[in-house]
């Protein structure tokens, strides 16, 4: 079907977003054309501002608008415990449980040989650097319950145990192949309560 070039560009751009197929991209594009121009400008401005002002925390790798992030600079949090997650969005899911008061470390991915992602492409060196002063007593591995997440957890477990730090893994009542961001608060709270050392 023929669309004017600007509309085609918008549909194509929206279709590049995760979880947005061609039909949804089309619906979103048509919706954006119907809303008042001020709403479209507000959306465009919000996207640009988020891209310009959101950075990675130099300590944990979480998204932030200041460095270090609010979690890393909070004196009320337990600085002797680090919870390792794959993506920054996983922190939001875990924080909703209100069960964990330690710090985080975002790997920005998981080991996936099929995709050419090894430990070198993840923020493993930065994690090791955080452990060298001896203040961290426990590292909780909260990677996803899929093949890549399990591979990453096993790799980190083996690596971190040589440093003498306690390494635990979240107990999962989550389906294998599931992502943390989609889990409900009760399931995540139980997972924190039942975490265990890998054997």
From Swiss-Prot:
Similarity annotation: Belongs to the RecR family.
Zinc finger (C4-type): 57-72
Gene3D superfamilies, A to Z: 3.30.60.80, 3.40.1360.10, 6.10.250.240, RecR Domain 1
InterPro entries, sorted: DNA_Rcmb_RecR, Rcmb_RecR, Rcmb_RecR_Znf, TOPRIM_dom, TOPRIM_RecR
Task performed by this protein: May play a role in DNA repair. It seems to be involved in an RecBC-independent recombinational process of DNA repair. It may act with RecF and RecO.
Molecular function GO labels: DNA binding; zinc ion binding
Name recorded for this polypeptide: Recombination protein RecR
One biological process term in Gene Ontology: DNA repair
Presence of the UniProt keyword Kinase in the record: no
Sorted UniProt keywords: DNA damage, DNA recombination, DNA repair, Metal-binding, Zinc, Zinc-finger
Organism, as annotated: Moorella thermoacetica (strain ATCC 39073 / JCM 9320)
Domain Toprim: 80-175
Record has DNA repair as a keyword: yes
Superkingdom of source: Bacteria
